[in-house]
Amino acid sequence: KRLLQDLNIKVNKVIPEGGSVKDLQDLPKAWFNLVPYREIGLMTAIYLEKNFGMPYISITPMGIVDTAEFIRQIEKHVNNLVSNKKFNYEPYIDQQTRFV
């Protein structure tokens, strides 16, 4: 969640973290879905993409390379959805990985 906060991205829902069946009605409100653990949420993400046109990212943000790719995928989806502003997260990636 900290990574998303750093990128000024508001989390709609974390499923199943404390979720209920009622929370499921809010899932289509998200712009895209994050599936950091494919074995848990990939089938749901595929369903939401097929039925609601919601893209998903299934990269696990662990390690420098995968975290950078995870952020680049977020940037791609955000830029596809927001037409009046373009986001560039490369400076953030550089800042987070410069001294590693």
Swiss-Prot record:
The gene is chlB. It is an enzyme of class 1 (oxidoreductase). It is found in: Plastid, Chloroplast. GO terms for molecular function: 4 iron, 4 sulfur cluster binding; ATP binding; metal ion binding; oxidoreductase activity. Binds 1 [4Fe-4S] cluster per heterodimer. The cluster is bound at the heterodimer interface by residues from both subunits. Its cofactor is [4Fe-4S] cluster. This is Light-independent protochlorophyllide reductase subunit B. Transmembrane segments: none annotated. One of its GO terms (cellular component) is chloroplast. Its main location: plastid. Pathway: Porphyrin-containing compound metabolism; chlorophyll biosynthesis (light-independent). GO terms for biological process: light-independent chlorophyll biosynthetic process; photosynthesis. Protochlorophyllide reductase is composed of three subunits; ChlL, ChlN and ChlB. Forms a heterotetramer of two ChlB and two ChlN subunits. It catalyses: chlorophyllide a + oxidized 2[4Fe-4S]-[ferredoxin] + 2 ADP + 2 phosphate = protochlorophyllide a + reduced 2[4Fe-4S]-[ferredoxin] + 2 ATP + 2 H2O. Belongs to the ChlB/BchB/BchZ family. InterPro entries: ChlB/BchB/BchZ, Nase/OxRdtase_comp1. Keywords: 4Fe-4S, ATP-binding, Chlorophyll biosynthesis, Chloroplast, Iron, Iron-sulfur, Metal-binding, Nucleotide-binding, Oxidoreductase, Photosynthesis, Plastid. Its EC number is 1.3.7.7. It comes from Pleurozium schreberi. PANTHER family: LIGHT-INDEPENDENT PROTOCHLOROPHYLLIDE REDUCTASE SUBUNIT B (PTHR33712:SF7).
